[in-house]
Amino acid sequence: MANEKIVQIPLANVARVELVTEETTPKTYVVDTANEMKLEAFVSEGEEKELRKLNRLLAQLKTEDLTKGYDLTMKDMVMSPPVFALVDGGVSTVGVEGKFEGYTGPTMGEVVNRTPFTVNIYTEEKDGDGETTGYLKFTCKHCKGTPADIEIKDGDFFAPEYKLKSRPKIGESPIAITPLDELPT
């Protein structure tokens, strides 16, 4: 029996994150200051049911685990008001000169109609001497944000942590990974 040759790809760093709104006219928010991304599978766990006669196993019924999507955590190094608004569900106001003028969160006690978006995460492929030889793009569709947690401490920079939920439609893949030679411009 021949051994199967496997491809090994050394990956490092969060090179870039894009949040692309799923609207008639999509908006792309590029986050180049994100320093940590975590993707955790959201799973419907299967079950096992046994048919036993005392110490003898007669039969089993099994259902497999099913992936329903991913829960993503994005840590950013700076505050980006439009990204904060997209994730939290409120409205960010920017003046004519691009200056941040304010943010209003969603109304307390009411259902928030958050805009769905696709998340593209780019990470670097490295070689033996540390050079970047390419990128991998991880894509999760139909994401929605959750209410933001805010923690501000003396002596530390504010670093927002966003929690996102990706829930693909029936028949869609929960994740796609695409190799790229370079980052998009």
Q: Where does each model-flagged region fall?
A:
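Basic/polar low-complexity intrinsically disordered segments
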Residues: 28-30, 112, 172
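Solvent-exposed edge beta-strands and adjacent loop segments
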Residues: 2-89, 142-156
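Exposed beta-sheet edge/beta-hairpin loop segments within beta-rich domains
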Residues: 63-65, 106-111, 127-131, 149-158
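Extracellular-facing segments of soluble proteins and assemblies that are Gly/Ser/Thr-biased and enriched
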Residues: 65-120
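Mixed-charge, glycine-accented linear interaction segment located at domain edges/termini
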Residues: 135-185
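Residue-level signal for secondary-structure boundary sites
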Residues: 80-83, 127-129, 148, 170-173
